[in-house]
């Protein structure tokens, strides 16, 4: 049985002032577990590729990369960048990762994803992968923004993710949780952080703002700004 590995970093808010936060950056652990595979012999499927952040990080190593995303604008940006870089082994396709049959994209040896995962994606990945091939991904953990009182429908708890992997036909070989928590001296610091990070506007429309205010008024002074699960699993 694979045990969960946990990493948590705590920051005082003052240490972050003036530094733009990047909540969609690539995990070094994710890159490591992907690059453990012989990528020069592999065709990769990058699910929810966006403008290609993960795909472009792997272009030197991979034999071929196919990125898929439902945002036509993001796919155009990715295609333009691949063309500018002369990368003829990288392809980007505009489609819905939860409805397309991955087998229609051709043989796939390794499925990867950065912060785009669902039970349906796991099922479709299992359908395209041969036994002993792998999926490796980062996904949101249920503790992401937990102080707001609202959990993303795309976020996983450890137990639910293990169940989804097992039911999808995967055997985990690496399971990790990476967290970053910011500590505030007072409520004003917390609200200032949300404004400077560009989060406030979205939270005011999706219900998180009111939940976070309630948390602050009750004396809470932390915010889990990053909570991701990092997974590598073998197709059974």
Features from the language model and the residues they span:
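Conserved class I S-adenosyl-L-methionine
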Residues: 1-40
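A short SAM/SAH-binding and catalytic strip from SAM-dependent methyltransferases
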Residues: 109-122
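Conserved Class I S-adenosyl-L-methionine
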Residues: 176-236
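Class I SAM-dependent methyltransferase "Motif I" SAM/SAH-binding loop
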Residues: 48-50
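Class I SAM-dependent methyltransferase SAM/SAH-binding core
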Residues: 53, 57-99
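A short acidic, Gly/Pro-enriched loop at the edge of an enzyme's catalytic core
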Residues: 102-110
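Short, glycine-/aromatic-enriched active-site segment of Class I SAM-dependent methyltransferases
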Residues: 135-154
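A short glycine-rich, Lys/Arg-flanked "PGG" loop and its adjoining helix->strand segment in the class I
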Residues: 121-134
């Amino acid at each position: 049985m694979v045990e969960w590995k946990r990493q948590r970093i705590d920051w005082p808010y003052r240490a972050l002032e003036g530094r733009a936060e990047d909540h969609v950056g690539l995990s070094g652990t994710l890159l490591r577990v992907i690059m453990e595979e012989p990528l020069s012999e592999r065709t990769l499927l990058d699910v929810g590729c966006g403008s290609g952040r993960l795909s472009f990080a792997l272009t030197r190593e991979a034999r071929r990369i196919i990125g898929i995303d439902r945002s036509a604008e993001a796919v155009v940006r990715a295609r333009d960048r691949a063309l500018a870089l002369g990368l003829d082994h990288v392809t980007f396709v505009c489609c819905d990762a939860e409805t397309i049959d991955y087998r229609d994209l051709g043989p796939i040896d390794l499925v990867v994803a950065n912060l785009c995962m669902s039970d349906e994606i796991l099922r479709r990945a299992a359908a395209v992968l041969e036994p002993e091939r792998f999926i490796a991904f980062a996904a949101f953990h249920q503790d992401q923004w937990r102080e707001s009182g609202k959990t993303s429908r795309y976020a996983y708890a450890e137990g639910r993710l293990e169940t989804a992997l097992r039911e999808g036909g995967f055997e985990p070989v690496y399971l990790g949780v990476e967290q970053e928590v910011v500590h505030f001296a007072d409520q004003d610091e917390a609200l200032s952080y949300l404004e400077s990070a560009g989060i406030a506007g979205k939270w005011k429309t999706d219900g998180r703002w009111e939940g976070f205010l309630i948390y602050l008024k009750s004396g809470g002074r932390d915010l889990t700004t990053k909570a991701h699960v990092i997974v590598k699993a073998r197709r059974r």
